[in-house]
A protein has these predicted regions:
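Aromatic-lined glycan-binding groove of carbohydrate-active enzymes
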Residues: 1-30, 56, 63
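Glycine/threonine-rich phosphate-binding loop and adjacent beta-strand/alpha-helix elements that clamp
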Residues: 67
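Terminal-tail/helix-coil boundary detector
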Residues: 25-55, 59, 74-78, 82-83, ...
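Structural preference for beta-strand elements that scaffold enzyme active sites
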Residues: 1-2, 87-89
């Protein structure tokens, strides 16, 4: 299993705080998919949920980005430890971002009250969140075997 878009379209970067259309970046009208991104993410519930997380992030001196990446590593359904083959796809625009993201991915589990805030935030945004998967999820083969079958 792989997590794509762990920063919720960049909302966990902390740069976007409201549904006001930015002048630059993926959410702007200058970007060819800006409108699609805004349709997916620019909802009142999304920004309300982010504010819940920001409060606990400040309390623990954590960045929103760090919270997102550490949650993926330690609190999601991913199996990354002890030989697990799951992962997180991260996008970066500089070597410094890559190094910072990798350091955050290597840090330990989040404090309990951060997890509680994330759970609360999910309950706030869940009713208006767009589902990524658009079709029925039906496999006609053993996915584990197809992906991880030992080579002869």
């Amino acid at each position: 299993m792989v997590i794509y878009n762990p920063l919720a379209g960049g909302l966990f970067s902390g740069k976007i705080k409201s549904s006001e259309i930015p002048q630059e970046g993926r959410y702007s009208d200058q970007h060819h998919i800006g409108g699609l991104y805004r349709t997916r993410y620019f909802k009142d519930a999304t920004f309300d949920a982010l504010r819940v997380i920001e409060l606990v992030a400040q309390k623990h001196n954590l960045t929103m980005l760090e919270i997102a990446l550490r949650w993926c590593t330690h609190h999601s359904a991913l199996k990354m430890q002890n030989g697990g083959r799951d992962g997180v796809i991260i996008g970066v625009s500089s070597l410094a971002q890559l190094e910072s993201n990798l350091k955050d991915l290597e840090k330990g589990p989040l404090p309990d009250d951060v997890i509680k805030a994330l759970d609360e935030a999910w309950l706030i945004t869940k009713p208006t969140t767009t589902n990524y998967w658009q079709l029925d999820l039906k496999y006609t083969y053993d996915t584990q075997r197809a992906l991880f079958k030992p080579k002869s």
